[in-house]
Structures are given as structure tokens and as C-alpha cells.
Regions:
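Membrane-embedded alpha-helical bundles that constitute the cytochrome b-like, heme-associated redox core
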Residues: 1-206
Length: 206
């Protein structure tokens, strides 16, 4: 029988709870006055980016380590990371909207490049989060993968939002560089698979 540790490792419910725990703490701390607006905006934004980066890093890591059990473990859990990214982005946006409290002001500020990129990224995340379930995968078929490829556009917009609104964008550039490096690995692996298939070789990375 599987050990308790193995059951915990494979529990999707536990993973969801771990991803939700910081969200719950951030919301509680803000509502009870333990954190201020600026701290809340930064923290929720950071968590959104971290979860997004983790979700996008799964495929490159699988390309780098195709036979490792931990990358196989990550693959079916990628959607949880994506939904968590949306949940933190939702918290990030909600805090901003509630703070402004005035729709005309929100709309006016939303036209600035720094905020417009954030709103566009958030708009892309909505359909991705709503279709991150097995039922949507079955109903949409091949269209599901095509839809979810727009996450890369959301990632670009997210980092643009971060760079344009940060007092010091150095951290944003560092995160973007790490993600770009991982994605370049995925693209190289994809190109190699294409050449391998064209020459009759294995379509899987070695």
C-alpha cells in the first residue's frame, strides 16, 4: 500500500490547499489591517508571477529532464499552478479596484501603458482559468491547446506591466530572463523533435 508520504505527495487536494494558503493569509492580513495597500499589491503580484512562472517552467523542465519522475509528477499539476496564478492576479486586481473605488478613475488610469498591460493580461487569464478543468479539455478537444497557448501573450503582458509600474524594474527583468531561458530550452527541444521526426527518428527528446 502507498505510504502516507506518497499519498500526500500525490494529493491534488493538498496541492490546492498549499497554493491557496498564501492567498488566504494575504486576504486575511489586508482585511484585518496587518498589511497596507502597497504591501498587498506587491505581494499578490509577486505570487501571481511566481505561480505563472512555475506553470510555464514545467514543459522546459520536462524537456531538460524527460526521464525524471519529478517532471512527470509536475505535468498533470501544471493547471493547478495556472489557476493559482489567476487567483493571485484576481486578488491583485481586486485590491486595486477596491482602493480606487471610482469607476471613471479606474477607466482613466487603465489607459496608461503600465495598467493597460496588466488589464489585458488579466483578461487573457480569465478564459484560461475557466477552462482549466477536465470537462473543458474534453469539450474543446484540440481547440483547448490552441486556446491555452495564449498564456504566452499573457506572460509577456504581465512582465510588461511589472516593468512599467515598478519603482525599480530590476527584479522584473531578472524573472523575465530566467523564464526566457527556460522557454528557449523548450523551443530548442521542440525544434529537435521536429527534425527527428522528419528524418524518421524518435519524436521524444533524448
Amino acid at each position: 500500500m502507498p505510504s502516507k508520504l506518497a499519498k500526500a505527495r500525490d494529493s491534488y487536494l493538498l496541492l490546492a490547499a498549499l497554493l491557496a494558503a498564501p492567498w488566504c493569509w494575504l486576504a486575511f492580513a489586508y482585511l484585518t489591517g496587518r498589511t497596507f495597500y502597497g504591501e498587498m499589491v506587491h505581494a499578490s503580484g509577486d505570487w501571481a508571477v511566481w505561480c505563472l512562472m512555475a506553470a510555464l517552467a514545467v514543459s522546459p523542465l520536462r524537456s531538460l529532464f524527460p526521464r525524471r519522475a519529478w517532471t512527470a509528477w509536475l505535468l498533470p499539476r501544471r493547471r493547478y499552478l495556472g489557476v493559482a496564478a489567476f487567483a493571485y492576479a484576481l486578488l491583485h486586481a481586486a485590491v486595486y479596484v477596491l482602493r480606487q473605488g471610482d469607476l471613471p478613475r479606474i477607466l482613466a488610469e487603465g489607459l496608461a501603458a503600465g495598467l493597460l498591460t496588466g488589464w489585458l493580461a488579466f483578461a487573457i487569464f480569465v478564459p484560461l482559468a475557466l477552462t482549466s478543468n477536465d470537462g473543458s479539455v474534453r469539450r474543446l478537444g484540440r481547440a483547448w491547446k490552441r486556446l491555452h497557448r495564449i498564456v504566452y501573450a499573457a506572460a509577456v503582458l504581465t512582465f510588461a506591466h511589472w516593468v512599467l509600474t515598478a519603482f525599480d524594474p530590476t527584479t522584473a527583468y531578472l524573472h523575465a530572463t530566467v523564464l526566457a531561458g527556460l522557454e528557449s530550452v523548450r523551443l530548442v527541444a521542440w525544434a529537435r523533435r521536429g527534425r527527428s521526426v522528419a528524418t524518421g527518428g524518435s519524436p521524444f527528446p533524448h
